[in-house]
C-alpha cells in the first residue's frame, strides 16, 4: 500500500485542514508506510507528529529511520529536508490520510458501533456471536477486551484502547477485509470522538445504550456536557440508529440522531413495563424477563411498531450470561442482527452461548458463597450488578473488592462510594491500575465518601490479598463481587503494564486453597 504526496495534499485541502506545505524536489513523493511512533518507521514513511507528549526529537528519530514526510500543526526545524504538511488538526488529518492509505477498508465492511456508559462490550460480543452464526465466522471485532481481525487464533489479540488510534483502526480494518471478514462490530468510546480517532467514519448501524457521568476528570472530559456531546456524535454519523428509550437525556440523543437520519431509520427499545408520558415517538421493540437464575437468563422480545414487525426477530431468547441488565444489552444486539438481515432462529442460536472473559463469571463455592468476577468499573455498572445480586439471592450479605484507576476517571470515585453505601455490607478497597497516583490516596478518597454505618471498609492495597480475605470471610449464603479488572492480566503502574494473574486466576487459586482443587468459573 502507498499514498502519494499529492493525494495527501488534495485530501487535506478538501477538508480545509491544510495550512501550508513544503515540498522537497529531491525527495520521493510516494509514501509506503504510515506511523505516529518514531520507533516504528520504514523507508519512505509518512509520519504524524501527534499527542500531548510529542517531542521534536521524535521527528528527528523518524527522519533518521526513513520518514520522508511529516504532518504536524506547526513546522519543526528537525524536519528540514522532509516534505512538511502543516495542518489545523493533526488528529483529523491522521484519520483521513490513514483511511486513504489503507484504501478505505470501511467501504468493504458492514460496520456497527456501540456507545454507552455501560454495556458496550457485552452488546458487541452478543452481536458478533449472532453475525458469526450467519456469516460463518466472518465478523471482526474491536472492543475493550479483544480485537479480532480474522479467523485464525493469531488474528485475535488483547486491545490496548476501547477504540484504537485512527491509524491503527484503519490498519486493523484493512487486515480484516484482507482476511475475508465481511462485518465489523466495534465499541466507540467518548474519547474516540474527543480525540478524532473515528473522524470521517460513517456506521451502518449506531447504538446508544445509556449514559451516566463517567470519564470526567483532568485527562478526560472536563464536564458531563462534553462527555454527552462526544457520545452523541455516534448518532450523527450512523445511517441507522438504535436507542434505548429508557436512558436519561433521551430527547437530546434522539434529536442528535434526527440531524442526519430519517426517523424511519431510528429504532427505539425498552422494557415491557417502561412508560414515559413525555415520549413523543413510539417504542419499536419491547422486552420482558421470562426467568432469571444463576444458570441462564431468559427473556422475550416483542416487535411493537409496524417497522419493527418487518424484522423477523420476535420471540424467546436465552443468554448464558447472567444479570437482568444483560436483557437490555441482548435486545439491542438482536435488533442490530435483525437489521443486518438475520431471523429469530439465527439470532437465538448465535446469542445463546456467548460469554466474555471477565464478565459475570461465577463460581458457587461449598462454604464461601457465590464468587463473581466482573468488569463493573463505574457507578452505573456497580449499582446494576449489586442490585441484581441482592434481588436474586434474597438480600444476601454482599462483599465487594474494588479499586479505582489513577490518572483518569476521577468522577468514578464518589460513584463507587455511593454504590457501596447503597448495597455492600463489606468493601475491600484495593489497587486497580493506579498509574502515577498513590493507590492508598485513591482508596482513602473512595473511603471518605462511604457511610460506614452501612458498609464496613478495609483498605488492602495488595489486590491478591484483598481477594483472598474477601472470599475467606464469606459464609455459604454470601456473595463476593470482585470488580473492575475482569480478565486483565496486568496492572498499569507508573507507565508500565505490570504482570498480574487476573482476578479470575487469583480467585480460582483462593478457592482451591480454601476448598480443594477443581476447575472453577463458568466460561
What residue ranges belong to the model's regions?
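Short, polar loop motifs at secondary-structure junctions
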Residues: 68-78, 143-146, 246-248, 270-274, ...
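Residue-level signal for inorganic ion chemistry
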Residues: 45, 62, 97, 114, ...
